[in-house]
C-alpha cells in the first residue's frame, strides 16, 4: 500500500530543491545524506528546519530532498521554500502561518550582472585626481 506523499519545489538564487514529505519520525535526507552531514554550518541547518518548527511538525514528518545548483546558502533557502510548499500541500490550513513568517514568497533576488568598465556589478575602478 503506497503511503501518502506530498511534493514541493523550492528555488533560491540558482539552486532548486525537490522536497517529498510523508508521515514519519522526523528524518531529513538531502541528496542521500543526513541534514547534519550535508550542511556543515549551523545557520544552514536552522534555515532548513524553520518551517517545520513554525508549524510544530519537527518529529512528525520524514523529508526526502534532492537539491542542485548554487552554494550552501542558496540551497538552504531553496530547501526551505520547497518544504513550505510541500507542507501547504500536506495541510492547506498551515498556509496563513507560513505566509505570515514569509516562507511562502519566493525570494526573487538574483546576482546583479557585471557591467562593462566596472570591476564588479557596482564597484568602480579607483579614481585618481592627478
Swiss-Prot record:
Disulfide bonds listed in the record: none
Gene Ontology molecular function: RNA binding; structural constituent of ribosome
Gene3D superfamilies the UniProt entry points to: 3.30.230.10
Pfam families membership: Ribosomal_S9
InterPro entries for the chain: Ribosomal_Su5_D2-typ_SF, Ribosomal_uS9, Ribosomal_uS9_bac/plastid, Ribosomal_uS9_CS, Ribsml_uS5_D2-typ_fold_subgr
Keyword Coiled coil listed: no
Keywords of this entry: Ribonucleoprotein, Ribosomal protein
Protein's UniProt keywords contain Hydrolase: no
Highest taxon of the lineage: Bacteria
GO cellular component: cytosolic small ribosomal subunit
Any Gene Ontology biological process: translation
Family, per entry: Belongs to the universal ribosomal protein uS9 family.
Name under which the protein is recorded: Small ribosomal subunit protein uS9
Organism: Sodalis glossinidius (strain morsitans)
UniProt gene name: rpsI
